[in-house]
């Protein structure tokens, strides 16, 4: 099993560069277990999802039940406390098996913002539910129609109003928003012309979309060549609790 993924690759590299290259632990047991799980979701399953523009709910549930989507979450919050290389191995194996990890990869890495920058209360409230799959954190609202790679030019605003923030603006190419309970949202809390640096004045929020979807949040699907669940989002005086702020305002 090692020779198939680890030693064989190392041998090929050694022939090219003239010395033996040793990979770190390649998570072979995890890869084999993920590959076995993926046999229940063959090409016909993925073709049907694409044909129907459907979200692979059964596949995501199977990954969640097996604990793979909580791989990077610490054990104290119900996760597996695995390193980032293990997360990469899981996603690689899904793709190697013919699946589509894009349907669920955000559940693994987006939570890192909460883990590294969230308050203790936010971690206790959200991470255990993200770990067991009862809450989906699949969406990350960053890109806008007028700001793609230049994130500092985004126009979505979040204005403090008492115990809330009021959000107005638009996001585009936000994947899986229709199938997510929570969303990380990047918005400007201080006008750009009032900031010493253009990277200042931006804040991150953890939005519970269940509370605002269909009211002050409108989600419109974008049809693309691939079944990637892309959407555009419209915020119309969307009111969220001040406790939704992750980390320090403007930083």
What are these regions (language model features)?
Residues 2-104, 125, 129:
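Amphipathic, small/basic residue-rich leader segments at the start of a protein or domain
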Residues 67, 90-95, 186-188, 207-212, ...:
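Short Ser/Thr-interspersed hydrophobic loop/turn segments at strand-loop and sheet-helix junctions
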Residues 102-121, 148:
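N-terminal glycine-rich flavin-associated loop
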Residues 133-142, 186:
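A short, Trp-centered hydrophobic/proline-enriched beta-strand micro-motif
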Residues 153, 212-239:
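Flexible, small-/acidic-enriched active-site or ligand-binding loops
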Residues 156-159:
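A structural signal for short hydrophobic beta-strand segments in well-ordered beta-sheet cores
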Residues 168-216:
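A short core secondary-structure module
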Residues 238-251:
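Long, acidic (Asp/Glu-rich), low-complexity accessory segments flanking structured domains
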């Amino acid at each position: 099993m090692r020779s198939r993924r680890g030693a064989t690759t190392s041998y090929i590299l050694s022939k090219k560069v003239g010395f033996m290259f040793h990979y770190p632990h390649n998570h072979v047991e995890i890869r084999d277990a993920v590959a076995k799980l993926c046999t229940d979701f063959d090409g016909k399953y993925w073709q049907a999802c694409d044909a129907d523009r459907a979200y692979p709910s059964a596949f995501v549930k199977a990954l969640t039940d097996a604990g793979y989507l909580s791989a990077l979450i610490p054990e104290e919050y119900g996760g597996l406390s695995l390193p980032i290389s293990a997360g990469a191995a899981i996603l690689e194996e899904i793709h190697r098996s013919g699946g589509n990890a894009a349907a669920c990869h955000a559940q693994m890495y987006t939570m890192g913002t909460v883990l590294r920058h969230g308050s203790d209360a936010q971690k206790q409230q959200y991470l255990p539910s993200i770990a067991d799959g009862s809450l989906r954190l699949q969406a990350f609202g960053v890109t806008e129609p007028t700001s793609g790679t230049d994130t500092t030019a985004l126009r979505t605003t979040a204005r403090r109003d008492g115990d809330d923030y009021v959000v107005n603006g638009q996001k585009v190419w936000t994947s899986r928003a229709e199938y997510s309970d929570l969303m990380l949202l990047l918005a400007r809390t201080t006008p750009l012309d009032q900031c010493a640096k253009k990277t200042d004045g931006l804040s991150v929020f953890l939005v519970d979309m269940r509370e605002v979807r269909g009211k002050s949040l409108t989600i419109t699907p974008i049809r693309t060549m691939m079944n990637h669940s892309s959407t555009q989002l419209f915020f119309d005086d969307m009111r969220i609790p001040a406790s939704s702020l992750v980390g320090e305002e403007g930083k």
